[in-house]
Amino acid sequence: MADAGQQRPLTAFAPPPPLWKHFTPDNLKKLDEIKKNASKGEDGKPQKKKWTPTELRALDVPPELHFLVPPEIPKSGHYSVFGELQSLSTALPSLQDQGITQLYPSPPTGDADREQPSEPSQPLNHAYYLLKISKSLLLNFLEFVGILSVAPEQFESKVEDLRNLFINAHHLLNLYRPHQARESLILMMEEQLSRTREEIQQMDKLKEEITGALEQLKKDGVDVDAAPIEAPDNDTKKPNVSEEKAIEDTRLVWELLDENN
């Protein structure tokens, strides 16, 4: 764990955490033995069991096996990915919280609504400000090209302006994510409802076809309301006249259904 506190050089691909060195074949075998002993039943034989991370953490394991047990999932705070801290909160942080200059007005908050309850708050027009930022990007890029042709050493300020414009544009696009999620869910529910309605229509259509086939059989003199003939206990017994008639009626029903389809 001493290596974790040392500063590592930045690389294109982050190195694995130091704890991977504990995942040796011997340690894995020891952990399997501990799980087998803990899962023994009354007969003394190990039982097949799917261990949850909570159950594994409750086992009495030696210190060298602690890294093999999944840690508890954090519910708050931050985690590090490629050397950058990421928040566990799903809320989109504002640009001011990230120390970035915001080039568009912030949406009205609840405090502003309570101060002026008679005036309804106007929602932020994302498309309008996205268009303005896009035009500013084109203008700043032209200025950047001009600076490179006249005084290339003065490019840093213009690059910072372009970077700030891109960050603001991406942040505005990310504000659409909740709306995109709602619309995607609505679309999925509408597709599911449409499939259910199609299945119901197919069932109603099949019901009408069967009803029409039965009505046609009644017109032909076939007694479709008669009780079905139970199959004989002896499979080798030959069918009698009534059984043959029932089989023939069934065959006629299927032929009529095939003709309608």
Swiss-Prot record:
Q: Extract the ranges annotated as region (Disordered).
A: 1-56, 99-121, 223-244
Biased composition of type Basic and acidic residues is found at 23-46, 234-244
* Keywords associated with the record: Activator, Nucleus, Transcription, Transcription regulation
Taxonomic lineage of the native organism:
Eukaryota, Fungi, Dikarya, Ascomycota, Pezizomycotina
Q: What does this protein do?
A: Component of the Mediator complex, a coactivator involved in the regulated transcription of nearly all RNA polymerase II-dependent genes. Mediator functions as a bridge to convey information from gene-specific regulatory proteins to the basal RNA polymerase II transcription machinery. Mediator is recruited to promoters by direct interactions with regulatory proteins and serves as a scaffold for the assembly of a functional preinitiation complex with RNA polymerase II and the general transcription factors.
Give the signal peptide as a residue range, or say none if absent: none
Q: Which residues cross the membrane?
A: none
Kindly give the PANTHER family that the UniProt entry links to this protein. Answer: MEDIATOR OF RNA POLYMERASE II TRANSCRIPTION SUBUNIT 7
- One GO term (biological process): regulation of transcription by RNA polymerase II
Q: Which family does it belong to?
A: Belongs to the Mediator complex subunit 7 family.
A single GO molecular function term of this UniProt record: transcription coregulator activity
What is the organism field in this record? Aspergillus oryzae (strain ATCC 42149 / RIB 40) (Yellow koji mold)
The protein's assembly and partners: Component of the Mediator complex.
The principal localisation class reads nucleus
Would the keyword Transcription regulation be found if you checked this record's keyword annotation?
Answer: yes
**Name assigned to this protein:** Mediator of RNA polymerase II transcription subunit 7
As for subcellular location, the record says: Nucleus
Q: Does the keyword Metal-binding apply?
A: no
**Which Pfam families does the entry link to?**
Med7
Q: Name one GO cellular component term.
A: core mediator complex
